[in-house]
């Protein structure tokens, strides 16, 4: 009987060790996917032009006109956070802040930016979340702390585009979750839609 109990205890300890080890590995893999993200960052424009050929002439025209610009803010922990932005083709107070998903970046959201900017005539701001794209950071934060950065990006967009905007905050995948977390915070008067 003692042998059976001892064997079960050893088996349970091995199972617990495997579960803890596997969990730590998966957590590290999901929050720090370095190789995956570097490859995505390096090929973002090529990927977007291949998947959405209509983007190339639009992005080229924005770049030729100097209308697709970079901006940065300093995060709460001192890290550099990056975003792309472009003014609408005609002056407007309508602005969209577009938040990307897990392991994506601002460039990979240009197809949504095209919809808002080219088709609907909105000003757009596309942030790279913490540890994504050209932003610094130590690990993916899965949206909870990112909500505070998005609130700051909303203020930046409002300032860049005239100070009295009517804003929509749009997210895809993890960006949608971040957007919903932002919606639970006290809102600025210029935010109209999520």
PLM regions with names:
Residues 4, 15-73:
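An N-terminal hydrophobic leader/cap segment in hydrolases
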Residues 57, 106-108, 134:
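Short N-terminal helix/helix-N-cap motif within the alpha/beta-hydrolase-1
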Residues 76-87:
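A short loop-to-beta-strand scaffold at the N-terminal edge of the catalytic core in hydrolase folds
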Residues 93-101:
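Short beta-strand element of the alpha/beta-hydrolase
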Residues 102-116:
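The serine-hydrolase catalytic nucleophile loop
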Residues 116-136:
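Conserved alpha/beta-hydrolase
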Residues 140-161:
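Alpha/beta-hydrolase active-site loop
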Residues 156-160, 165-194:
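Primarily recognizes the serine-hydrolase "nucleophile elbow" in alpha/beta-hydrolase
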């Amino acid at each position: 009987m003692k042998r059976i109990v001892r064997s079960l205890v050893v088996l349970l300890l091995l199972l617990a060790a495997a579960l803890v080890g596997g969990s730590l590995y998966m957590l590290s893999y999901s929050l720090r996917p370095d190789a995956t993200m570097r490859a995505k960052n390096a090929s973002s424009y090529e990927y977007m032009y291949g998947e959405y050929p209509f983007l190339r002439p639009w992005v080229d025209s924005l770049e030729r006109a100097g209308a697709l610009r970079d901006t940065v803010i300093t995060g709460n922990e001192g890290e550099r956070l990056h975003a792309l932005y472009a003014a609408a083709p005609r002056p407007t107070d309508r602005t969209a802040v577009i938040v990307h998903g897990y392991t994506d970046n601002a460039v990979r959201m240009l197809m949504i930016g095209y919809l808002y900017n080219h088709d609907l005539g909105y000003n757009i701001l596309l942030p790279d979340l913490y540890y994504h794209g050209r932003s610094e950071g130590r690990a993916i934060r899965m949206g909870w702390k990112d909500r505070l950065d998005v609130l700051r990006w909303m203020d930046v967009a409002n300032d860049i585009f005239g100070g009295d905007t009517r804003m929509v905050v749009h997210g895809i995948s993890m960006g949608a979750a971040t957007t919903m977390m932002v919606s639970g915070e006290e809102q600025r008067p210029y935010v109209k839609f999520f």
